[in-house]
Structure formats: C-alpha cells, structure tokens
C-alpha cells in the first residue's frame, strides 16, 4: 500500500539505506501490466522514488523452485495430493480445526500433476518476532499448519519468493501492513530452513 511504501521511504531516508521496489507477482493473475501500474504510478505521484528495481518475482521463478527442491531434499518439505475438498471433509469428519491435518506428511507420495509441496513445520518450539512497532510477538509452531510452498501447477508461493529475495537482496528491514503479520513466522521458518542466517527485522504497521 502507499502507506507502507511511505513508511519504508521515510525509514530509508532517515537511516541512509536503499529503497528497493519488488513486485510480488508469483500469482499468475497478478502478472499483468495494469497490476504493475497500480503499484508504480501512485509511488511516482507521491515522489517516492526507489533506488533499485522494480524486481519482478515472476522473472525469478527458477530461484524459488531451487529453494523448494532443496527443502524437499533436506526433508523439510513434502509432496501432498490433498485438495481442499478432501481436507475439509476429513476435518469435518474428525472435528479437527487446525487447517491442514498433516495427512501426507509421512506418506512419501511421488510428485505429479496437481501435487503441491508443503513445508514441514516443526511441531515444537515457537517463532519469536521482535517487531519494531509491536514489540515481542510469539507464534507457537503447533499453531502453524504445514503450509503450501509450491502450488499444484508447479509455481512457488510468495512466502518462498520473499525468503529467497530477502536473502539475495540483503534486506535488513521489512516494513509492511499488519495484515501480513501472520505470514511472517512462515517466512522466518523458511529462512531458517534454507540456512540463510539472521532474518530481517520486521515492523508491521
């Protein structure tokens, strides 16, 4: 949003950093000229000029797929052939209310058409986020499901793209809307599983 962009721009100017514009268009529906213009034109109108980019995630897919495959190879992710209907039916029958029920976690199914890849979220421990605005925020791993990192059509999700790009671009600070707070522990888990070292500092407006 323009609000988040403004806070990023002001932060960068205050601490003499680099303002990087990244277009998160891993979803094919968003990889359209009108979507790009809806991002860049308001920034230009506000005078929020970026130092690098724009970088389009849709043009960096190979990097993300490499990261996903490395997680599978390390046993940190697995193939899943469950569609939404199957998951909802099992949850209804069992009364499970935690989202995905880890049905395929130990099944060792092969890759195939329509098969997704899920991250194997640690069952113990927690993710601690020292949010620059909200202070210490804790997410228990037991409350985070095994989330999808590659869609059934073979494309990676933005969570993987963000982790890879943050590492590649040496991002030190991420300032964004509070609506993305619940995705942050997932990005941090991916960051750690990919052995990227210390993740960026986060601030959720």
Residues of each region from the PLM?
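Active-site cores that bind ATP or allylic diphosphates and position pyrophosphate for catalysis
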Residues: 57, 73-74, 78-204
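N-terminal Rossmann-like or analogous alpha/beta NTP/dinucleotide-binding catalytic cores
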Residues: 1-94, 153, 182-200
